[in-house]
Amino acid sequence: RQQAEALRERGFAVCIGTAGDMDFINSIARTRGMEQVLMDLIEDNPVYLEIMQARFEFFYEVQRRTLEAAGGLVDFAHAGDDFGNQRGPMISPAIFERHFAAKYGEYFEMVHSHGARTMMHMCGCVERFLSRLIELGLDVYDVVQPTTPSMDIAVLKERFGDRLTFCGSVCVQTTLAWGTPQDVEGEVRRRLGLFPQGGLFLGPTHAIQVGSPLENILALYHTAGSLAETIDEKILSLGTAAEQSDKINLAKLF
């Protein structure tokens, strides 16, 4: 609670959890292998189901206790699962319903009971799951990956924007990695232009990749800051990349 109070006093939103909380596909695949996990889901493998249940119970209880201790000061509870990849969904709606829907519904309900909003990380093409996740109680979708099929953020906003807040959308695969600062500025302006009344947490589509030009990263924050009412003054006061590169803690920027 003291940490939450300190963050609130500094004007920050308070978020608990990570993209690795729950995470029944990707994290379990790190030990069993992705092919095996996908087969497990099809075959209802009891070993996999036992691991999944253990993860669910662990992260559910960790977040429940954290929310309870914070006493209503948490804004968002974060979890994640990679239901999609670069080319399309990795599982069917039937598999989602059989293995994941009830667990996420129970988790979202618990989070809401403590006055927090739900936030879920999903890589890749996951458009087909958004309606159902909204029904189950999802509030914020992290992160919009625009280089995948069916994930145009303008279309997603049109379809789901009245029920869902989006996070991300500035591409780490193209614009930030290979573009110019002017390209980054243009993408930031286009993204924010789609959300004149809010509904987007602007940011990169994933972790900014090693080798991405520092000038592009700074362009993201400078442009967003010039269009926002408030932003961290430390970021806006940075000098040239050459002068400041050794002073920037990138982890704190994201």
Question: How should each PLM-predicted stretch be described?
Answer:
Residues R1-F254:
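Active-site loop segments of alpha/beta catalytic cores
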